[in-house]
Amino acid sequence: MALEFKDKWLEQFYEDDKRHRLIPSSIENALFRKLEILDAAQAESDLRIPPGNRFEHLEGNLKGWCSIRVNKQYRLIFQWVDGVALNTYLDPHKY
């Protein structure tokens, strides 16, 4: 697995198909697909496809972290190290 989680509940959602109150039912399918993409990625370039991922390197307080979009509000944030997404967590991005 090229994916390590910060939160146990997100890991259980992905590996055991276990629902959690912090994951809105409206994003469950998209979130699972994005986690599959993240898990299968071997290089940063794999995360740029599809363009809807909106892969980016973050700045400021999150310098050294990356993100892909689940939808307009939610992001998966992680540290990309040697082809592995570390400390992956779901962020309800506030605009």
UniProtKB/Swiss-Prot annotation:
The record's listing under Pfam families reads:
HigB-like_toxin
Print the keywords alphabetically: Toxin-antitoxin system
Asked whether the UniProt record includes Transmembrane helix among its keywords, one would answer no
Matches recorded under InterPro entries: HigB-1 (IPR007711), RelE/ParE_toxin_dom_sf (IPR035093)
Inducing stimuli = Induced by amino acid starvation. Induced by the protein synthesis inhibitors chloramphenicol, kanamycin and to a lesser extent by spectinomycin.
Miscellaneous comment text of the record: HigB-1/HigA-1 has been shown to stabilize plasmids very efficiently in E.coli. Three hours of ectopic expression of higB-1 results in bacteriostasis without any detectable loss of viability.
The protein's name: Toxin HigB-1
